[in-house]
From Swiss-Prot:
Signal peptide start-end: 1-22
GO terms classed as biological process: defense response to Gram-positive bacterium
Protein name (database record): Probable inactive ribonuclease-like protein 13
Subcellular location(s) per record: Secreted
Pfam families, A to Z: RnaseA
Species, as recorded: Rattus norvegicus
InterPro entries found in the cross-reference section: RNaseA, RNaseA-like_dom_sf, RNaseA_domain
């Protein structure tokens, strides 16, 4: 009986980090779809004073964090057209401790940048619409899902 309990304890200690990592990755994949893909592009009411102000209010609400991110990238393309670039990710980005890749195709992207001329308690954003390639973070090396956008090329 004692050896069964010891075996169970060892299994819990070994498997728990894997389960937590799996849950974290699944959340990151879900958040990528929700927070970085807007296709077709939504229109926010005029009261939001622009696309990025409406979007970033949504992003902060979804993350349950009222911190104002300095920059946020939103891709206006179907998820599947972005996802395929994480199928074979040979690069490892040590700064992020994740696999990463540069897309071969350009995508329509809105870059939301925090307006520096504002009160510290408000989050006001400028919108820039561009068409560029993406540096993506991927959930693993092969057959992966995108979990973040780390820059443009």
């Amino acid at each position: 009986m004692a050896s069964d309990a010891a075996s169970l304890l060892v299994l819990q200690l070994v498997l728990q980090p894997t389960l937590v990592t799996g849950i974290t990755i699944q959340t990151a994949i879900k958040n990528f779809r929700i927070l970085h893909v807007d296709y077709p592009m939504v229109n926010y009411p005029k009261g939001f004073h622009g696309y990025c102000n409406g979007l970033m209010a949504y992003v902060r609400g979804k993350l349950q964090d009222w911190y104002c991110p300095k920059i946020h990238y939103v891709v206006h393309a179907p998820f599947e057209s972005i996802q395929k670039f994480c199928k074979y990710s040979e690069s490892f980005c040590e700064d992020y401790n994740e696999y990463c890749t540069l897309t071969q195709n350009s995508f329509p992207i809105t870059v939301c940048t925090l307006d520096h001329k504002q009160a510290p308690t408000s989050c006001s954003y400028n919108s820039t619409l561009t068409n560029q390639r993406l540096y993506l973070l991927c959930s693993r090396k092969h057959d992966a899902e995108p979990i973040g956008v780390i820059g443009l090329y």
